[in-house]
């Protein structure tokens, strides 16, 4: 089941991805929620002593969790965790169907939370500025070292070196490396933080531009940290990292977004025959009517370490 470091793309091609977990963080999350299920079975059905015999209680447990008011994202996580363990795929008739996730019901980093009362913004000012200027996840903040800062000049030098390799002689890893490096051409910033493979979500590698009015302070901290030392030895558990990523995402979107009226009408709706803007994203649900620039959303998505613009629209960009 554990396939850390393996290529998920190749596993999908070979049809072996359903039985594998490619990210250690995903494994930890799944195991955490599976243990909740185990505890439930042990307490309610003490005569059930094996995971095989406990399988019949999966849907009962998930129904209980939904009745208790668990959020839709948590329900999806628990259903996936137990589905992965027992080999129950989402298209299986026995797979528990969690409630749909709606943007308007997301509470994470929306408004004040109890934990905010235990977090001093003044004492953690540098951390907050660092997060808002880099958009890193908590796991990435915990992992980056002094050696993980790089300039656009150095990135372009590596691109030039790799492009000298004849295309017919380039390996798949070289082509992938080139794609990652070339993503930095979407940005104008000179300094980037290198998120190495295996650190971020899904193990994806990327270069996040350092942006905003506190960029110099962030760069200075990175440069002042020895190459083999962590930039942040301690990150307050109550720091709202997701909220700071939202600020970072919104800043990048605003820097690259075109005025909606300036985006060309470049396609025709087959049903109505009316001209349409293919590069305009139409928000849904509680934000219906809002329009966003798809090109700017993609740039924002790359900086955050995502590959889907709808994730950016639903979870990060705000206040527009």
Model-derived regions, located:
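Basic, Lys/Arg- and aromatic-enriched nucleic-acid-binding interface segment
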Residues: 110-138, 283-284, 291-297
């Amino acid at each position: 089941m554990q396939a850390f470091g393996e290529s998920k793309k190749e596993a999908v091609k070979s049809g072996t991805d359903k039985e594998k977990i490619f990210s250690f963080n995903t494994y930890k999350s799944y195991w955490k929620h599976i243990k909740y299920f185990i505890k439930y079975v042990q307490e309610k059905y003490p005569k059930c002593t094996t995971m095989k015999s406990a399988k019949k209680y999966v849907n009962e447990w998930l129904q209980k969790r939904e009745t208790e008011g668990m959020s839709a994202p948590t329900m999806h996580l628990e259903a996936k965790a137990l589905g992965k363990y027992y080999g129950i795929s989402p298209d299986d008739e026995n797979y528990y169907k969690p409630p749909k996730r709606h943007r308007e019901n997301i509470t994470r980093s929306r408004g004040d939370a109890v934990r905010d009362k235990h977090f001093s913004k003044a004492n953690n000012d540098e951390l907050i500025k660092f997060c808002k200027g880099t958009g890193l996840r908590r796991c990435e903040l915990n992992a980056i070292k002094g050696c993980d800062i790089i300039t656009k000049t150095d990135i372009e030098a590596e691109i030039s070196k790799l492009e000298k390799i004849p295309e017919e002689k380039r390996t798949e890893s070289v082509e992938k490396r080139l794609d990652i490096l070339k993503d930095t051409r979407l940005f104008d910033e000179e300094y980037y933080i290198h998120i190495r493979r295996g650190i971020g979500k899904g193990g994806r590698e990327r270069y996040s531009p350092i942006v905003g009015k506190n960029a110099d302070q962030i760069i200075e901290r990175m440069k002042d940290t020895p190459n083999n030392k962590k930039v942040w030895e301690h990150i307050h558990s109550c720091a709202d990292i997701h909220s700071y990523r939202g600020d970072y995402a919104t800043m990048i979107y605003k820097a690259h977004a075109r005025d909606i009226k300036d985006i060309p009408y470049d396609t025709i709706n087959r049903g109505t025959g009316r001209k349409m803007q293919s590069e305009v994203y139409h928000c849904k649900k509680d934000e219906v009517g809002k329009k966003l620039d798809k090109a700017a959303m993609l740039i924002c998505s790359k900086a955050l370490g995502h590959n889907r613009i709808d994730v950016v629209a639903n979870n990060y960009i705000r206040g527009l």
